[in-house]
């Protein structure tokens, strides 16, 4: 296989590699859509004391497939007075922008589709496509409810995009890089204590709230508030084109959760199978107090496989997916718990509270980074800095 690949010209290798990466990203996006949709339906049923889907497949786990087939075969109805091209293209722009985020998500050491040096800037650029898709859908539908939803959505997305980017700047300052893989490596120095969640707790909270608004998730789903706007910019869509918006929404949810896990929870960092086996072997051997044949065998096996790239990649994917779906669960929990806010409350929260708080976080991070030079140049949090300052003064 490698001989055949090496026999190809560099141009063909680039093209085939691009097609393979795009195909894998598309499949991964659809897998996340399936998992998120099923998890949403099960969690909502659990929180509302219902059973949820359980008839189609084992415990209802094929229900999302049945839903997609139903929407695929539904009659396509396009109103006569729509702007044809804007109306048709909008769902696909939203779907493509959702999948583009996965291009720069690192799943392991060198396990990444495209390791951009300006990964954070790429994320900010991709966010702009959501605004375009939302406004195109509202304008192209030529419907008052769609237009109102699109205007709300555009204002909301633009406002919270600024806040989200400002919240991430603190992480960039601590890592010293815009590359997501470098941000993960910067969090590996002290295990989970090195996660940026702790020194960047302010930025994390701001990012979490802003991402819910960016994803148009409750309690910030004002662009499609059913009680006010029928379905917002989705009003005139039906069948599979409506399903494209739903695909984009859930793929976006998983993608932004993966970004949060990468920025604040160490990304793919975590114990590998070899490290777990070696640790278990040390426990069975009493940490050197005595020798146990089983413990020695487990220890040697763990040390032997600790250098396996494939197993380390599997462990990286496992930890990233686990952390990602922690955020997915959190977003769904919030959706089915909190009531929807008003549009004026949403805008006030973004511009008058979250944006100033994120700017304060940048100032605080810069100050602590500057003062940390006096304490061996170690990135520090507010609490650890206070303790070190007291120790230095005393």
From Swiss-Prot:
Chief site of localization = membrane
Coiled coil region boundaries: none
Q: Which reaction does it catalyse?
A: a quinone + NADH + 5 H(+)(in) = a quinol + NAD(+) + 4 H(+)(out)
Q: Which topology term describes how it sits in the membrane?
A: Multi-pass membrane protein
| Subunit note | NDH-1 is composed of 14 different subunits. Subunits NuoA, H, J, K, L, M, N constitute the membrane sector of the complex.
Q: Is Cell membrane among the key words of this record?
A: yes
Is Translocase one of the keywords UniProt gives this record? Answer: yes
A GO-annotated cellular component: plasma membrane
Top-rank taxon of the source lineage equals: Bacteria
What HAMAP family does the record point to? NDH1_NuoH
**Function noted in UniProt:** NDH-1 shuttles electrons from NADH, via FMN and iron-sulfur (Fe-S) centers, to quinones in the respiratory chain. The immediate electron acceptor for the enzyme in this species is believed to be ubiquinone. Couples the redox reaction to proton translocation (for every two electrons transferred, four hydrogen ions are translocated across the cytoplasmic membrane), and thus conserves the redox energy in a proton gradient. This subunit may bind ubiquinone.
Family as reported in the entry's similarity comment? Belongs to the complex I subunit 1 family.
Please provide the Gene Ontology terms (biological process) for this protein: aerobic respiration
Q: What is this protein called?
A: NADH-quinone oxidoreductase subunit H 2
- Its EC number is 7.1.1.-
Task: Enumerate the GO terms in the molecular function aspect.
Answer: NADH dehydrogenase activity; oxidoreductase activity, acting on NAD(P)H, quinone or similar compound as acceptor; quinone binding
Transmembrane portions of the chain: 19-39, 85-105, 118-138, 157-177, 192-212, 245-265, 286-306, 314-334, 346-366, 371-391
Its keywords, alphabetically, are:
Cell membrane, Membrane, NAD, Quinone, Translocase, Transmembrane, Transmembrane helix, Ubiquinone
Enumerate the subcellular locations listed in this protein's record, separating them with semicolons.
Answer: Cell membrane
